[in-house]
Regions:
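AlphaC helix of the eukaryotic protein kinase fold
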Residues: 83-117
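Activation-segment/catalytic-loop signature of the eukaryotic protein kinase fold
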Residues: 128-129
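Protein kinase catalytic-loop region centered on the HRD/HxD motif
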Residues: 185-197
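C-terminal lobe helix-coil module of Hanks-type protein kinase domains
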Residues: 241-308
Length: 308
């Protein structure tokens, strides 16, 4: 079985005829689990799909259900390490133990938060959460599709892509398609906000566009529960360019409006191909440019919706 696309092919071939993956290719991330590793006597680990500051996500194969899945491993860089080719992780310092354990509990809480929405078409499905190799793993569905960031890039190939810049154009979509995507996103957010959960890390990287055109929200690693009648101190977790000013402070109150601000930024970016001025910078000098000043076809009413 190919450890990249998980298709079956004859043993005499070293190159997968379906995706071109070469058997025995070293992992791009040295500290990632070696392809072919079996977790919980059931899940065959494949190649890395993505990696961030708190975890590594792999494509995998469920030998019991015989389906392709995704597995997210708790791996906070800076706190832990792994000898290449081995399975257990080790702390980079003994003093890291409390922080690591607290983070792993938060990782497990992420799985529980996601599992609440397994009946929803707008949130990635979670099948299980297990602990092994000194860490934890979230077993979830493998989504056939692309991130919103990738989707915009592919559908508008003639424009330059530049990260987090308010002065240089990224790619953009039509008004109609931009509104369709944002409306679907708002529908999903209404569900998770109804359970008292805020995502806190919304961006085109965490929105998947499926082959049928629907969307799924992924990566709830920064998600937190909120109470409408209380003020709670929260850790500073934010996505630069998409975060409201209150997200820069541990003591500021955060609620569903934190996510709604990010939705406004995403809509602004889809319509104009640019990111607006960051919220924190606007506190000292508000230089926000209206979407219609960048893209003349945008009507005034849509300006009001975006900047509200």
């Amino acid at each position: 079985r190919c450890l990249h696309c998980m298709e079956i092919y004859q043993d005499e071939f070293d190159v997968c005829p379906f995706c071109g993956f070469v058997e025995g290719t070293e992992p791009e991330i040295a500290y990632a689990l070696p392809p072919g590793t079996v977790v919980a006597d059931r899940y065959i680990i494949g190649t890395v799909i993505g990696a961030g500051g708190f975890g590594i996500t792999y494509v995998a194969w469920d030998t019991k259900l015989e389906i392709k899945i995704a597995i997210k491993e708790y791996f906070p860089t800076g706190l832990v390490n792994r000898i290449p080719g081995t399975l257990p992780i080790s702390l980079t310092g003994r003093n890291n133990e409390p922080v690591y354990q607290k983070g792993m509990q938060g990782f497990i809480d992420e799985a529980k938060a996601l599992a609440k929405f397994n009946e929803s078409s707008g949130v990635v499905n979670v099948f299980d959460c297990i602990e092994e190799n000194g860490t934890a793993y979230i077993i979830m569905e493998y989504i056939e599709g692309q991130t919103l960031k990738e989707y915009v890039s592919i559908n508008q190939p003639d424009c330059e892509v530049v990260e987090h810049s308010e002065s240089v154009s990224t790619r953009k979509l039509s008004i109609e398609e931009s509104l369709q995507i944002v409306q679907a996103l708002l529908h999903t957010l209404k569900l998770i906000h109804g359970e008292g959960i805020i995502h806190r890390d919304l961006s085109p990287d965490n929105i998947m566009i499926l082959k049928d055109g629907n969307i799924k929200l992924i990566d709830f690693g920064a998600a937190r529960f909120f109470a409408a009648d209380t003020t709670k101190s929260m850790s500073v977790v934010l996505k630069a360019g998409y975060a409201p000013v209150e997200q820069y402070s541990r003591s500021s109150r955060q609620d569903q409006r934190t996510d709604l601000y990010a939705v406004g930024v995403i809509l602004y970016q889809l319509l104009t191909g640019k990111l607006p001025q960051e919220a924190f910078d606007r506190v000292t000098e508000d230089r926000l440019i209206l979407p219609s000043e960048i893209e003349k076809t945008i009507p005034d009413w849509l300006d009001s919706v975006v900047v509200k």
